[in-house]
């Protein structure tokens, strides 16, 4: 009997609704943050934002369709 686990990839999102930046962060910042949220791995995309792989469906990731960065709460 198999079990299907839904996962998603995407940019980590901060409490302000913006992508989580990584330009001035230590090298392992993004992989550590992705792991903390139960993602498999991650990296600093173009030294601008953390991108994570295999995140649980419940993890908040930035999406263009629901972008609220810079738009208040």
UniProtKB/Swiss-Prot annotation:
Keywords in UniProt for this one?
Answer: Amidation, Disulfide bond, Ion channel impairing toxin, Neurotoxin, Secreted, Signal, Toxin, Voltage-gated sodium channel impairing toxin
UniProt-listed CDD domains? neurotoxins_LC_scorpion
Question: InterPro entries recorded for this chain?
Answer: LCN-type_CS_alpha_beta_dom, Scorpion_toxin-like_sf, Scorpion_toxinL, Scorpion_toxinL/defensin
One term under GO cellular component: extracellular region
Q: Which residues form the LCN-type CS-alpha/beta domain?
A: 8-70
Annotated signal peptide: 1-7
One of the entry's Gene Ontology molecular-function terms is: sodium channel inhibitor activity
Under the heading Pfam families, the entry gives: Toxin_3
Tissues expressing this chain: Expressed by the venom gland.
Question: Disulfide connectivity?
Answer: 18-69, 22-44, 30-50, 34-52
Compartmental location? Secreted
SUPFAM superfamilies found in the cross-reference section: Scorpion toxin-like (SSF57095)
Matching entries from Gene3D superfamilies are given as: Knottin, scorpion toxin-like
Q: Which residues carry this modification: Lysine amide?
A: 71
Role, per record: Beta toxins bind voltage-independently at site-4 of sodium channels (Nav) and shift the voltage of activation toward more negative potentials thereby affecting sodium channel activation and promoting spontaneous and repetitive firing.
- Family of the protein in this entry: Belongs to the long (4 C-C) scorpion toxin superfamily. Sodium channel inhibitor family. Beta subfamily.
What else is on record for this protein? Negative results: does not affect the cardiac Nav1.5/SCN5A, the peripheral nerve channel Nav1.7/SCN9A, and the voltage-gated potassium channel Kv1.5/KCNA5.
Domain comment (free text): Has the structural arrangement of an alpha-helix connected to antiparallel beta-sheets by disulfide bonds (CS-alpha/beta).
Q: What is this protein called?
A: Toxin Td10
Which organism encodes this protein? Tityus discrepans
């Amino acid at each position: 009997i198999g079990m299907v686990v839904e996962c998603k990839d995407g940019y980590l999102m901060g409490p302000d609704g913006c992508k989580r930046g990584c330009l001035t962060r230590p090298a392992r910042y993004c992989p550590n943050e992705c792991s903390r949220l139960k993602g498999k791995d991650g990296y600093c995309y173009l030294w601008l934002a953390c991108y994570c792989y295999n995140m649980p469906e419940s993890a908040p990731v930035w999406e263009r369709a629901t972008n609220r960065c810079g738009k208040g709460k």
